Amino acid sequence: MEPHRVLVLNSGSSSVKYQLLDMRDRSRLASGLVERIGEETSRLAHTPSAGGGAEPRERTGRIPDHDAALKAAAEELAADGLGLDSPELAAIGHRVVHGGLRFSAPTVITDEVLEEIERLVPVAPLHNPANITGIVTARALRPDLPQVAVFDTAFHTTMPEAAARYAIDVETADAHRIRRYGFHGTSHAYVSRKTAELLGRAPEDVNVIVLHLGNGASASAVAGGRCVDTSMGLTPLEGLVMGTRSGDIDPAVTFHLKRVAGMSADEIDVLLNQRSGLVGLCGDNDMRVIRRRIDEGDERAALAFDIYIHRLKKYIGAYTAVLGRVDAVAFTAGVGENAAPVREAAVAGLEELGMAVDASLNAVRSTEPRLISPEYARVAVAVVPTDEELEIAEQTFALVGDRGPRFGQVDN
């Protein structure tokens, strides 16, 4: 039997998420999360396939590092008869947040590739080090197995220079790799393709505005399956209002905080990335809590919601102009998939752009892709659940199976 399983790893600074998929039918065989790595309160939650007969289980107690975390996950998989030593395992696919301009496609990890990911740490200091740790640990566990990097930034490498460049001194920008890279690309790729499927059309024939709204949030303009603009930039701080991030802000605010408030660069970093956005505006970053507070008459929560929606509308309008013709707007991720009031408010008043939401369709809760716009609307408005793990597995299996990466090539 040919190897047909892919293990997907998403290594964070203090956590590891994993999923094992059978690529014959794209089914999940098991998934899990190891969190609070390095703390006394470390926790591993493992969920076997619903049809496998095994029960979800949990273990607690200190897991000192990522090596121990991945070994613990491997033990749980082995307990379900899904060990990493199985000949059915084809590859391990790794989420890597930043691939710069070199990596425009999923890439088999070699020593050279790993060195290049390490060279990108200065532009992704919060994410790439953890991704590297996961790769090194997995390679040590299965040195004989293909390991594939799937980059969050890859989908956005098709942006034209006019969208990707900042209007700053070119020599300075090039010397320090300062440009707009974009993030959440794996989600944007998956959702834009699924939106085309929902419309019964080929991705090459569809222009989509994808709104990935989670605690982190980003928008993208996708023309014929290729990203032509996205809201995040050099880092995930740019763009939409997010759970704890400010999104777009006048750069002079940082100078002002340094000169007037005496804040250091690190303090400003923490302010804009961890103490801003919805949590900075009203103290909460859970949209369900914010909506409940609004219903109770909380003015701060109402203002935070209005600012969030205002920014969303600006990007929908801007990307309508960028695309020229919009066939669909797709909401995805935690807030986009579950917060009907956000979807309704974001599209309200955009009838002149051909966009509208049907209240009854918008109220339906489902895990399937679905339209929520009325039949008369010129632009389809959709809810399309994202599946980044499946997309990583698809791209990994396509590469290892010698069917070629989904988009682009590695620019050597």
From Swiss-Prot:
Its cofactor is Mg(2+); Mn(2+). Substrate binds at residue 95. ATP binds at residues 17, 212-216, 286-288, 334-338. Its main location: cytoplasm. Pathway: Metabolic intermediate biosynthesis; acetyl-CoA biosynthesis; acetyl-CoA from acetate: step 1/2. One of its GO terms (molecular function) is magnesium ion binding. Mg(2+) binds at residues 10, 388. It is found in: Cytoplasm. The active site is at 152 (proton donor/acceptor). InterPro entries: Ac/propionate_kinase, Aliphatic_acid_kin_short-chain, Aliphatic_acid_kinase_CS, ATPase_NBD. The record marks 184, 245 as: Transition state stabilizer. It comes from the Bacteria. Pfam families: Acetate_kinase (PF00871). It catalyses: acetate + ATP = acetyl phosphate + ADP. Transmembrane segments: none annotated. Keywords: ATP-binding, Cytoplasm, Kinase, Magnesium, Metal-binding, Nucleotide-binding, Transferase. The keyword Ribosomal protein does not apply. GO terms for biological process: acetate metabolic process; acetyl-CoA biosynthetic process. The keyword Cell division does not apply. It is an enzyme of class 2 (transferase). Mg(2+). Can also accept Mn(2+). Its EC number is 2.7.2.1. Belongs to the acetokinase family. Homodimer. Catalyzes the formation of acetyl phosphate from acetate and ATP. Can also catalyze the reverse reaction. This is Acetate kinase. It comes from Streptomyces griseus subsp. griseus (strain JCM 4626 / CBS 651.72 / NBRC 13350 / KCC S-0626 / ISP 5235). The lineage of its organism: Bacteria, Bacillati, Actinomycetota, Actinomycetes, Kitasatosporales.
